[in-house]
Amino acid sequence: MARPRAFDEAEVLEAAVDCFWSQGYEATSVRDLAAEMGITGASLYNAFGDKRALYELAFDRYVRAGVHDRIARLEDLPPLEAIETFFAEVVENARADPARKGCFLVNATLELAPHDPEFRGHVMDVLDAMQAFFRRQVEKGRALGVVTRSGAADEVAGMLLGQLLGLRVLSRVDPSPERLNGMLRPLFALLRAPPQGDGTAPP
């Protein structure tokens, strides 16, 4: 009969998230992880497998709270409010990040995904989920007449996703709300731009 674990799995996984998020995948050793998680190296391997497996579990935990739970919480807001609130929370998270750790998802995208095809697919699933959220809001906004930007809804959603990723990269250099919100105001204005060729000027 297996012995019960002498630690809280959710608690130690959260510690692993913090460790990987602060140091990155390559710079984090198993010894670093064990010390941060408050368990032995043997317990780490027995419970979670190797460093790569633990990184994926930490990534999943971050994505669940930082992406999927956020999407679920914002999904039923009015469409423009849902989009703007998503970005506003990103700006606030950057402001509240004195260590400038950035976004775990973006960090993983830049560090590990280019060299790990399996993990790259994992990252793309998350990016696709965010783009799908933006697409749904654009489609709902058009149905309500509050999003008037021309172009395919998925392309507009891709523009929003690209701006989001760029915002998170920039926030590691300059997380000031003034700079970040200054990037977002024109973006939000574009969503309200009239369809091309209708002869009217944007408000």
Residue ranges with predicted function:
Residues 81, 117-143, 154-158, 182:
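Amphipathic alpha-helical packing segments from all-alpha helical-bundle domains
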Residues 12-20, 90, 164:
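Short hydrophobic clusters on alpha-helical segments that form packing/core surfaces
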Residues 85-93, 128-140, 163, 173-203:
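C-terminal peripheral helix-coil segments that are non-catalytic and often amphipathic
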Residues 82, 97-118:
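Amphipathic alpha-helical segments used for helix-helix packing
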Residues 11, 19-53, 57:
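Helix-turn-helix
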Residues 101, 106, 151-170, 183-190:
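Hydrophobic alpha-helical segments that form the core
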Residues 70-102, 153-160:
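Hydrophobic alpha-helical connector segments
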Residues 8-17, 33-34, 58-62, 66, ...:
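Generic hydrophobic, amphipathic alpha-helix propensity
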